[in-house]
């Protein structure tokens, strides 16, 4: 079944700051979507709303026309929305397997079987029994992704995912995200990096000062035009 995520008139106001100003967007599975903007554009607030960390002051979120009440991260998980934050939410002194088992519902043996199936399917390779603190940034991110995949997500949101990755780790991430997309997972990619948007994503929504100012197909965009939309003026060449 195709996945349709619709954000309708979302607003969030903090003292002295309109973080999200009547934001409406629609995403469908089969594509990778970018949410692009400078720091302070409103991306992080919208991500926190979609992941249930905070609630909007106004507006609604629909998944396949079901009105989601995202009052907590648990609500997002129940509705098959997976989230990989920029700063990894892992227990450094615990092993990879111990981290993955925290939210698991099956016994350890069954869980290891499922994890190994994911490893084989996506060509992941991580020692399950080493402490997380011994992993590279790219490996830690894979642990977060695996944790999401264990819940069979319909939506996977990646928040500034390449900020601490090497070039090789970034390439590996892109390959994985394209595979997830091909399998029907709706991917929302949060970033301020223009070249990544053009090389990975199918559509891009540009945010500025809490508003969505542009939605377009990336094949029709260039770095310069996206940069102009981000800052709200034509940049000098």
Indicate residue ranges for each PLM-predicted region:
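Glycine-rich phosphate-binding loops of nucleotide-dependent enzymes
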Residues: 2-237
